[in-house]
Amino acid sequence: MVEEEFMNEFLKKTGYQVYKCKKCGERFWSLVPRDTCPDRPCSKYDFLYNEYKGVPPLTFDEARRKFIEFFTSHGHGYVDPYPVLARWRNDLYLTIASIIVFQPAVTEGIVDPPYNPLVIVQPSVRLEDIDNVGLTFGRHLTSFEMGGHHAFNKKDQYVYWVNETLQYAFDFFTKIIGIEPENIVFKESWWEGGGNAGPAYEVLVDGLELATLVFMKYKIVNGKKVRNPVLVVDTGYGIERIAWFTQRTPTAFHTIFSSLLETYKNILGIDEPPYDVLKKIVYLLSDKEIEDVYMLNKYLEEIDYSEYYKSLVDTINLYTALDHVKTLSLMLSDGIVSSNTGEGYLARLVIRRLLRTLIRLGIKVSTLEDIVLELIDKQAKYWKGRYVYDKFHRRLDYILDVMSYETRKYIDIVTRGIREVDRFIKKKKKITFDDLIQIYDSKGIPPEIVVERAKHYGQEIRVPSNFYSLIAARHGGSQALIKEKEHELPDEIVEWASKHDPTKKLFHENPYLRRASAKVLDSLNEYVIFDQTIFYPRAGGQDHDKGYVILGNEHIPVKHVYKVGEVIVHQLATKRRLVPGTQVELVIDWYNRYRLMRHHTATHIVLGAARKVLGEHVWQAGAEKTVEKARLDITHYKSLSDEEIRKIEELANKVIDERIDLKFYFLPKFEAEKRFGLRIYQGGAVYSPILRIVEIPGWDAEACFGTHVYNTSEIGGIKIIKAEKIQDGVIRLEYIASTRLPEYISDLQKEVDKALKFLGAKGLPISIVAKKVSEELDKYKTLLIQYRRLFKEILLKHLLEEALEICGLKTVVIEKQLEDEQLYKSIIEDLSLKKRVLTIYVSDKFVEIAIHPDEANNRKLDLRKLVEILQNMGGRGGGKPDHIYIKIKEPKQIVKLIVEAITNLLCKA
């Protein structure tokens, strides 16, 4: 069935006719007869050699400017680009297209767009095709600009649809870019993404797709197409491709990076094939699907250009480096923190692929860090003052710091990883694709190293050409982020509450209100909904209020408070039904509430302080505010120093001393974003037309549901009591505020007094006592070393005197339980390595057996065979041919068996 959007009037009126491509079988519209569509692989990049008299060459910046000017002159409001880190979404990590800015809030009619229609040129990042970067000479990029003009049609507001969209595309490409109408083809297509779908047209000119025009009329619900409440025009014009088309350079990289490409060639020592040769190769290969360098070599042989294979492979790696450095600069300058989860994982994936690419280009590990930092610096200089890319320069210190840290980490992983890979390969008879992913995910070791090591063991492994693309897809932008559940209400209660009108939130109107009257709207079991409430529910990491409901002379405790949409549900301590319409009094525990208010405001202050001390990349990764303390998880790539913690605390307390009045606003979504920036989404995405903004002027502003003090001075003071790295890329700060401070100090003093009393030094300064204890410990450590050495000499002499002789090999069995781990390990080492004695150490829980590697080799002895024997007796362990360790129950009872087994092994050997 042909979608109605493909039966449009504009194309017919303009003289376009429908044709069917003889190669791909798809329908397309053209002004001139054609057998095939001008889309690869049905056609080559004919644009590279065609003469377009009316098409002047445009730079990347000029192509963007012309696109914006055309649509603003046609009544479209201009929207500034958003970051590539999609903080306003809870189902995506990265901004993969311009429509992402408006999904799902605008596309589903929840929120009105800032303008209708609108135009935006959105830098985007897609990693699903990362392995194709370079190989396709610019058709695939990990970061690119998507020019989008969007219209949102509702029942009561028609803006424009198919005919107008096609008219805009036709006019832009003919009147602004200067392409002859006969060269422009509209190919029918279908598009899905971000939960929406619809028919589409691809705008093709001589082998290059310049734009896609999508008519988003469906949303995908449980895998099925459902009519969308808003008909969305979603267009994507490739700004880089438009510039490439007008310049007709051999690759898109020459157009995008221009002089920077030459700079990178000099730094990396790369020579491209001659310009004309490169252009010819790109043209001849443009209708081929090249998945890897092996296929590249095959096709070069077919077109008689195989002599350029080595040069072309290096050139492709050069293009990859250019692309990846730009993408990383985008990701990091927008605040992504490299880690092993979420968007941080994706950043690290690009970083490590870049590093591997540079190593393939012959960069030595010893100079890798310096080269990476130079490439980053040159990229920042190239983009300085140009569109959003100026932030590369502004945030260069952070980008360089992260890249330096990640490069050193990668070198360490690769260096240590060889041994781990060797062990893994020895265990596995055949390395699978899942094994490669496991090694990469758990150890960070790239598949290329596994391949190299496997060759030493006679294994041939072929890494899928799209390995990194598959990795990106597994961890990528389309998967939902894990969100903490705010409550565990029964489904029936959630369904019941959802049917009611929003509760009036008195705790927002006046958070200092301790008592208020309310009317019962409904109740079910112990759950009650009032028309209004002063009780704050558990939400946004803040604990719920405590208190009670006064019904006549009865005081009913409130056990828990929940938020279901805009309805506040109160759970009473007893199961009882309150009659709808009944008037009650609500009373909160003010002591509890006020502490929560101060801890919540303290959290906003600490977050602002952390950002000022550590950098703009700091973002809230989680938070909890309780009566006892508060915690804030922040994104940061390394542990905090004592000095950094001190500075954060000092800045936070300065804000308290400045006695700043907080401000509270209820603003439309896009107005809030424009006024305060996307940092308002510290607590995650908010899908609401109106946002509640809590501002500490000059310090912090966030979309926040919580209760706060009116002035920062009410907090009294903030003390950070703990700072730790809880996972890669996340630091947890724990702190207390207000009246918790004297309690904390009192608790600390009690612990100090206990310690001093235990040491018999009550009343003395703890630093003096600690110094004295430390000095005494050092003295006893020295004595212990001397005694250990003396005891070891005596024990070694005794053990050697009682040594067994097994087939000509001196053997010592140690059945004495040595609680001193350092001593027993030293004895095993001395006996096995220095004395060349087969050593069997038997403790209460394990057996450890060691021999000099040369002795094991000369006698063809493999101690691991003992592991197999002991595993049959319930033992667990492993090791090397010359050293094994086995945990086993009651090992002393099988000493005789162990000796017999060793005797059999030795005598047979």
From Swiss-Prot:
A GO MF label: tRNA binding
The organism's place on the tree of life at top rank: Archaea
EC number(s) on file: 6.1.1.7
InterPro entries: aa-tRNA-synth_II/BPL/LPL, Ala-tRNA-lgiase_IIc, Ala-tRNA-ligase_IIc_anticod-bd, Ala-tRNA-synth_IIc_core, Ala-tRNA-synth_IIc_N, Ala-tRNA_lgiase_arc, Ala-tRNA_ligase, Thr/Ala-tRNA-synth_IIc_edit
Entries under Pfam families matching the protein: tRNA-synt_2c, tRNA_SAD
Keyword Lyase: no
Cofactors, names only: Zn(2+)
GO cellular component assignments: cytoplasm
Main location class: cytoplasm
GO biological process: alanyl-tRNA aminoacylation
UniProt entry keywords in alphabetical sequence: Aminoacyl-tRNA synthetase, ATP-binding, Cytoplasm, Ligase, Metal-binding, Nucleotide-binding, Protein biosynthesis, RNA-binding, tRNA-binding, Zinc
Residues where Zn(2+) binds: 600, 604, 704, 708
Cofactor note: Binds 1 zinc ion per subunit.
Cellular localization per UniProt: Cytoplasm
Record's catalysed reaction(s): tRNA(Ala) + L-alanine + ATP = L-alanyl-tRNA(Ala) + AMP + diphosphate
Function description: Catalyzes the attachment of alanine to tRNA(Ala) in a two-step reaction: alanine is first activated by ATP to form Ala-AMP and then transferred to the acceptor end of tRNA(Ala). Also edits incorrectly charged Ser-tRNA(Ala) and Gly-tRNA(Ala) via its editing domain.
UniProt domain comment: Consists of three domains; the N-terminal catalytic domain, the editing domain and the C-terminal C-Ala domain. The editing domain removes incorrectly charged amino acids, while the C-Ala domain, along with tRNA(Ala), serves as a bridge to cooperatively bring together the editing and aminoacylation centers thus stimulating deacylation of misacylated tRNAs.
Similarity-based family: Belongs to the class-II aminoacyl-tRNA synthetase family.
Protein name in the entry: Alanine--tRNA ligase
Native source species: Staphylothermus marinus (strain ATCC 43588 / DSM 3639 / JCM 9404 / F1)
Lineage, highest ranks first: Archaea, Thermoproteota, Thermoprotei, Desulfurococcales, Desulfurococcaceae
Gene that this polypeptide is encoded by: alaS
